[in-house]
């Protein structure tokens, strides 16, 4: 069983990223030429130090040392962007490449609009090209990983690049596995406790995010507090109690 998101796959020789100049063979609109070929990164949220508090919603959880969250006070902005993306890519947004992104335009480290099997468009980052017809992607606003075909991708136009990446990678402060790695049961237990829920986060520190591939993103180290009516509950304490019963 895989406890955490992997996002990477085996290296494949002869990927699309090795093509010298696909613009010679494709009619590329000037706006796409500027945005897609230069791999301009999306903006990211920056956080002050030292200790501070945030209202967060956990969007995905692998284990206590690897989970992602969104800021609750940014949810309205993300929902507005997602709504606009659905309308745009259902019509003129896909008109440049009606059959999907040409394989020659698929690049590691570039951002695209990706059409998921749930019939929703998302902002995605290509982490690895797995051959000419498959890409490993990271859903930058939700912290999820997946695989997509070029036919499921479209250019991410400038109007959808202004909002900073909304999924932030994090870990619980002072929590380590009893052994070298988290067990599958511990991973499942942690996910059941936090996934999809809102907490008060007490941020203890930060470091560069080396997991997601998002340029200049930060990884936050925090305590998660469930502000229940009967009193504050620390997630790490609940997790320790549940693990003792496994």
How would you name each of these model-derived features?
Residues 1-246:
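Intrinsically disordered, low-complexity segments and flexible domain linkers enriched for serine/proline
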């Amino acid at each position: 069983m895989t406890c955490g998101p992997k996002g990477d796959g085996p290296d494949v020789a002869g990927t699309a990223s090795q093509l010298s100049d696909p613009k010679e063979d494709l009619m590329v609109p000037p706006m796409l030429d500027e945005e897609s070929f230069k791999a301009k990164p999306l903006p990211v949220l920056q956080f002050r130090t030292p200790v501070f508090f945030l209202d967060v919603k956990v969007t995905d959880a692998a284990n206590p040392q690897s989970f992602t969250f969104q800021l609750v006070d940014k949810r309205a902005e993300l929902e507005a962007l997602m709504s606009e993306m659905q309308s745009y890519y259902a019509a003129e947004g896909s008109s440049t490449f009606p059959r999907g992104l040409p394989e020659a335009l698929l690049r590691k480290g570039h951002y695209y609009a990706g059409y998921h099997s749930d019939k929703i468009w998302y902002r995605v980052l290509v982490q690895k090209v797995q051959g000419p017809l498959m890409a490993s992607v990271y859903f930058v606003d939700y912290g999820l990983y997946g695989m997509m075909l070029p036919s499921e991708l479209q250019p991410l136009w400038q109007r959808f690049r202004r909002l900073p990446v909304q999924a932030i990678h994090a870990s619980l402060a002072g929590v380590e596995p009893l052994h070298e790695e988290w067990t599958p049961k511990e991973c499942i237990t942690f996910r059941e406790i936090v996934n999809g829920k809102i907490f008060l986060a007490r941020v203890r520190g930060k470091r560069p995010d080396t997991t997601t591939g998002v340029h200049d993103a930060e990884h936050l180290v925090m305590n998660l507090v469930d502000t229940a009516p009967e009193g504050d509950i620390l997630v790490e304490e609940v997790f320790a109690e549940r693990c003792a019963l496994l």
